[in-house]
Amino acid sequence: MSLFDKKQLVSQADALPGRNTPMPVATLHAVNNHSMTNVPDGMEIALFAMGCFWGVERLFWQLPGVYSTAAGYTGGYTPNPTYREVCSGETGHAEAVRIVYDPSVTRYEQLLQVFWENHDPAQGMQQGNDHGTQYRSAIYPLTPEQDAAARASLARFQDAMQAAGDHRTVTTEIANATPFYYAEDDHQQYLHKNPYGYCGIGGIGICLPPQLA
């Protein structure tokens, strides 16, 4: 596919077929030695896409209350895709991070603040120099409460951009969560394993206004 095509979302009919076998995933998180797959009682899951997942995952594993993070693919059609397939633009997936967190320590609203303030949500099918549908900005809520919070936060951030003189339209996709497929082990906790590796994300200098009571 050409670069132009890679910035157009593929249709389900044209998406790659994928495979039935899930990607092997390490048992333990390379940073904190917590389970990569289990969700302890009382914890919740959040899914965000905001560009290259290497830097995004590091942002979230550093937060208090975050039990584990994982790099992966979601929002598309191809089951159990490879990194190469996702980069082709023919799966429909975004590079995303799965966050398991303790809501008694860090609220979903705080995760949303990290999301909005650490990337450019008005770039469409790219993030910085990374071009393609896999780099789109997206929030994939898993509950009605997450969906409502995500949509309210988008409206507040859009207003904050306008107030700051940035009149672009936020292009962040908010859609119900679809299956999350773990990325290859090389991509998990990449910037822990490769401290000088590429990050590629950065905010636009605008803060998410607090939620009104």
Curated annotation (Swiss-Prot):
Protein name: Peptide methionine sulfoxide reductase MsrA
Molecular-function annotations in GO: L-methionine-(S)-S-oxide reductase activity; peptide-methionine (S)-S-oxide reductase activity
PANTHER family to which the protein is assigned, alphabetical: MITOCHONDRIAL PEPTIDE METHIONINE SULFOXIDE REDUCTASE (PTHR42799:SF2)
One record GO biological process: cellular response to oxidative stress
Catalytic activity entry: L-methionyl-[protein] + [thioredoxin]-disulfide + H2O = L-methionyl-(S)-S-oxide-[protein] + [thioredoxin]-dithiol; [thioredoxin]-disulfide + L-methionine + H2O = L-methionine (S)-S-oxide + [thioredoxin]-dithiol
Free-text function comment from the UniProt entry: Has an important function as a repair enzyme for proteins that have been inactivated by oxidation. Catalyzes the reversible oxidation-reduction of methionine sulfoxide in proteins to methionine.
Gene Ontology cellular component list: cytoplasm
Active site annotation, chain numbering: 52
E.C. no: 1.8.4.11
Cysteine disulfide links: none
Gene3D superfamilies per record: Peptide methionine sulphoxide reductase MsrA
Protein keywords: Oxidoreductase
Family that this chain belongs to: Belongs to the MsrA Met sulfoxide reductase family.
Protein species of origin: Enterobacter sp. (strain 638)
